[in-house]
Amino acid sequence: MSKKLRVISSSIFASSLALSSLGMVSSVTAQDQSTSVDVLTIKDQSGDHMIVGGTNQLANDNKLIVFNDTFSYYTETKKGSKEIILEKTGLNTYRVKNKTDGDSPIPQNGLVLSTGAKTTAEIDSFLIQLESGETVTLLEPVVKEEEKVANAIDPTAATNPAGAPFDGFRGPDQLIVYHPSFGETTKTNAFGYEITVENGVVTKLGGGGSRIPANGYVVSGHGIAAKWLTSNSIIGSKVTVDENGSVKIIQDVDSYAYQSEQAIQQAKASMEKAKTNYLDVAMNKAKKSIAKSEKLLNEAETVKESAPVKALDFTRQATQSAYDAYYYSLPSNAAEQRAIWYRPEETTLEGVKQILDRMEEAGFNSVYLETTFHGYTIYPSKVMEKYGMPGQHPRFQNGEYGGYGKDLLAAYVQEGRKRGLTVQAWTDGFMVGESSLGIPPAFKNHPDWAAIQRQNNTGEPLPDTSSKYYWLDIAQPEVQKFMLAIYKEMQLNYEIKGLNIDYMRYPHHDFEKSYGFSTKVRALYKEQTGIDPVTLNPATNPEQWEDWTTWLRIKENEFVAKLHDQAKDINQKFMMTATPEPGPEAVLISDWKDDIDGVIPQAYGHDFNSIQRTVQDSKKLMPAGTMYYTGIYSFYHHLDEMGNVDDVLSAKHGTSGVNMFAFGQASAPSVDALGKGPWREKALNPGEEPILATQTVLTEIERQISDIYVEQGALDKKEGKALKQSLKRLNKAIHKNPEHMDKEFNSIIKQIDNLMDKNKLKQIVGERIKEQLEEAKGWVEYSLNHQSPSN
């Protein structure tokens, strides 16, 4: 086929760090591109070019998008897209593997070329004529410049009315510049992206409410502007803002070199901290990675003038090696939850194994597997069939899961166990469908089970006017009976460790959109009170309206109590967790204080303060002894690998672990980073096995006393031996008689205090051991309060 195509224009450049050689294996030789370009460009084997219109962008209509493996394992694009999968063969060369119609797998270190169902003739023709096995070349500009005019500089409500109602006076899709005269911080919320600029160079990325440096400023974006910043900013980018508010971001070889230097400094600082604080880390691996990084950076400097593209490649590799050194310098806990939410899609056993292998590589120890969604179960359900509904989600009815038959849940439970991953059932509760999928299966035979909004005069099942979701009517006794049967079936037939309940209340709406107005629920309330709730109005009947909404809330709480009692009657160790979203649902979590074992508050932000604020606000609502994990959205928001690691470290602080949302958006680099860093070693899950987790931590402290603290002079040898004996006695006692462990824990803590007072134990080590013991003591208390037959 003739290849006579012209280049189309675009102003979108490549995103940072990943396009040419990140993670490149040593067998790939570096090649310098001979063609100079101003924008990111794909060149086919015949020499024809096509300019790339964006990187890692889901909006792919009428433009050519390049996806790399920093985005996810899949492109997540819509079916009907036209995509070409490219496998890496050299520094900037790729081999055409095959073509797909959307949501393509992204090869590790490879690319996917993508355009939407609606596209230009030029892009369509270029992709059509690419042949399997053909070599294509990615041409990158050595210097990348992007420019965008800010909506406001140092805004006020008066100067930026569009941003007046919002934190930091930053409105939707706006780009704002903040100078020190604005204040100490930008005062923005977590729903955006910010770059900190010092002396004209980007020194910090991400987050909200950033501190404004005295020697620079912060550029902050929301929505479209946030995407512009993330696509064009790296540590080391050069930034200028002119008198008209035009923000210019420049990336060049020096920018990437600066990024590498900063990464090396960060890693060295972390390594020094590990040494000074006697932390248990992979120091030898960290040292090797730092040496490799510095060698690559020197090579980049050598060829910077003669081969700038090769220099760019070396600096990227140097940055990656420095990142690895940082990850290796982080401690890895012996006991904590490392959980991942996941909606399964696999129709083969090989697909299940691939997902679980990747989860294991990251270091996860628990899968919160979505076992019910869109009104179906993922496993063959006799309860569903009994009530006249399909026995399994149609996607999995013809699945082939080897010895597990068509049972996807069984495959996940058993294959997960082989890899050290337990399964907790994540359920969509009373949300049973969405409008785009049509009437949910439950309402085809049981239309009277539908939850009805006040403004629904038809009485027929209709989706929520806001979310477009369909809801079962939680206040109806028959509906509760059905749902309890589903959860009982799941718990009895599968070795799941717990149930993560979601959507266990009516949607929270104002008067006209409020729920609870089905014929059956209205009749039930009228029978008990003599009042038809549809006649009530909070404006004219405030007390009666409050009585009505309280009655509905009691019905919701009664169901959760029944579910708790049913689960604990089957298995006292079975874990009930809730995941409240910020807002009314988070506040109401205290209603379930006697029925919930663990709470996973959802922290949408990506900085330590916002994550911790979410956790601490939730803890105020629940009794001491409740198991707490932190839910974070690092994968879902497509943070880079370092962002994922930072989020995990922030989220673990003050809790017993982390839940990440969601593995469908995970990326290979982030999985690799977690597996090298904070989740390098296997960890016991304290919510599922609190006593075993406690014993594991005690044994680990014993090992660290011998291998690190005494060896490196942080603890007197004789006193170290005595402390180990105390820990051994405690370990044995916990196994035999956990009910009376407070005294033993406190005795060892006092022993540690005495050692610190006598300068026979370094303060930093003693405080860390005390913190570990306090956490472990809490796990024992959790076991007694939540897993004991008397509770």
Residue locations for each model-derived region?
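Sec-dependent signal peptide cleavage junction
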Residues: L19-S34
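Substrate-binding cleft of secreted/luminal carbohydrate-active enzymes
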Residues: G236, I596, I600-L784
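Active-site-adjacent "subsite" loops/lids of carbohydrate-active enzymes
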Residues: A334-I340, K406, Q424-N493
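Catalytic domains of carbohydrate-active enzymes, especially glycoside hydrolases
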Residues: V352-P380, N493-K497, V599, G657
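Aromatic-lined carbohydrate-binding/catalytic grooves of carbohydrate-active enzymes
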Residues: A362-Y404
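Aromatic- and acidic-residue-enriched segments that line the glycan-binding/catalytic groove
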Residues: Y379-Q392, M431-D464, Y503-N537
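Aromatic-lined carbohydrate-recognition surfaces of secreted/lumenal glycan-active proteins
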Residues: T422-G429, E434, N500-H508, P538-V587, ...
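Aromatic- and acid-rich polysaccharide-binding/catalytic face
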Residues: K497, D502, I531-E543, E585-I611, ...
